[in-house]
Amino acid sequence: ACGTSVPQRWFEAMKKLDFIVASDLFMTPTIMGLADVFVPVATFPEHDGIVQPHFGRCTHFLGAMNKAVEYGETKSDLEICFDLGKRITPEAWPWDSVTEFYSWMLEDFVGFDFDELRARDAYQAPYQYRKYEKGLCRADGKPGFETVTGLVELKSLQFGAWGDDPLPYYIEPQYSPYSTPDTYKEYPLVLTTGGRKFTSFHSEHRQIDSLRRIDPWPVVEIHPETAAKYGIEDGGWVEIENQFGHCREKAHVTPTVDPRVIHAQHGWWFPEQDGEAPNYYGVFKAQINNLMPHEHIGKLGLGAPYKCLLCKIRPVMGLDD
């Protein structure tokens, strides 16, 4: 529901694959629309595991997850990978169990096995300060940082080697009031997206009733002057459109956005709606990525115009009307 620009294009491309297996905690539009087989995964109380809260091997803290309950035949993500790996390339999976794999990983990382982590409840690695002075930041063991020069680089020599400007620079968006004034006449508002709400993480948690009661609908923030200009009322449905696509969200009239800008939420779908084709939980109805073009990216292939496009808006009766 939020992974890419031009989502319908990717949806049609994925349908051409011969076979798709999906695993998740809940049914989703992707599963309903694409998966040949759905494997429900175990929730965190249903499997053993290791908590690494700070990006894997960069963590300073580890905790043990101890399986508390077992329901049906669900397996964790790692157990599914483990079972597949043992069958497809057994030489790459020499461990006899997932917990043995955890012990192997821990022995290399902190020097003790999974059973000891369970006994400890949690482990915090000792801190080392000024690692750059001791050669602990670089793969070659030399003092400094893991950059070409070993220094904190305000000028990135690596970017220069890749053919980009080694210094920060600004490029006007491909579609903006300044770069495309003719397009701006037809689509006179700047569209920005991607703001977060604490009730969800991208498309996650839309199916949790208590969180949906807090944020029941997708919202587009509009300045009062802009709302008055286009006849839009607070709480009313709005269609957002540009040359690439359209979607619908509910208006939140607020002075916190610039009158020239609207801010639309992303990652919406409606688990209460029909999940079968062609609806797929209504994932394309409030899909702000419908308005995002493909391949409008930076020189090195990064970025997309999720924060800076042009659009127009109009009041509508509802999500489907």
Where in the sequence are the language-model features?
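Short, glycine-/Ser/Thr-/acidic-enriched flexible segments
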Residues: 1-2, 26-28, 43-46, 67-69, ...
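Glycine-rich phosphate-binding loop of nucleotide-binding enzymes
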Residues: 1-37
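Short acidic, glycine/serine/threonine-rich loops at helix termini
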Residues: 5-7, 31-35, 49-53, 203, ...
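Short, solvent-exposed amphipathic alpha-helical segments in soluble enzyme
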Residues: 8-15, 37-38, 181, 206-210, ...
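Short His-Asn-centered micro-motif
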Residues: 22-24, 41, 222
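Flexible glycine/proline-rich, aromatic-decorated loop/lid segments
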Residues: 26-64
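Long, contiguous, secondary-structure-rich segments that constitute the structural scaffold
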Residues: 68-71, 75-122, 208-221, 225-321
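Long, low-complexity segments enriched in small/aliphatic residues
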Residues: 102-208
